[in-house]
Amino acid sequence: MKKSPLLLLALCAVFSAPCAARADDVALVEIKFDDGTIRQVTIEFYEKDAPGTVANFKKLAEKGFFKGCAFHRAIPTAIVQTGDPLSKKKDRTAVGTGGPGYTLAPEIRRRHTKGAVAAARIGDKVNPQRRSNGSQFYVCISPQPQLDGKYTVFGNVIRGLDVLESVSNRSADTNDYPIERILLKKVSIVPREKLSAPATAPKPGAPSEKKPLLRRLWPW
């Protein structure tokens, strides 16, 4: 049967519209604390600099992969890390080693400025290609220049960095795992225009800004 030009145009519109609408998506991350409090963080993506990593993050978010993942690493006013599916259980033995079952090609282009969101990975000795873990990610509460050129930065926190700083300051065990179970309740991908007001990224390098550095490079 011969399809009319109008039908073809309609089909093209149906299949291409979602892709066009997703060009400037953001992630709304709901974080649940032990006392039941829920706070929200908004992340923008670096689509051009890390397209593969961004696409993977969106895919996992839309599948509900991140729901229930705990923050399993927190360094005060420096970095917080989450995204390990093994952290959904209370057994902490293997937490930090999990993922979706695959790794991602490195897209190392951006710097670790304040608010940077980056993909975690295992160390260079066993991972000289610097491939990223498929789901674990961390957020820089303050600039971490010693990590530049080593990890894929794929986004930036534009709202709620204070929430993550609060997470980083919680009491933790000797492995930097917060004693309190702080969970990703939900990660949603939405068009930026649906945000209630314009969101702007925090200004890195403010004169009064404290810049604590990590005590060590972790074998992610």
State where each predicted segment sits.
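N-terminal secretory signal peptides that target proteins for export/translocation
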Residues: M1-K2
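Cyclophilin-like peptidyl-prolyl cis-trans isomerases
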Residues: L8, P18-W220
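Sec-dependent N-terminal signal peptides
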Residues: P5-V14
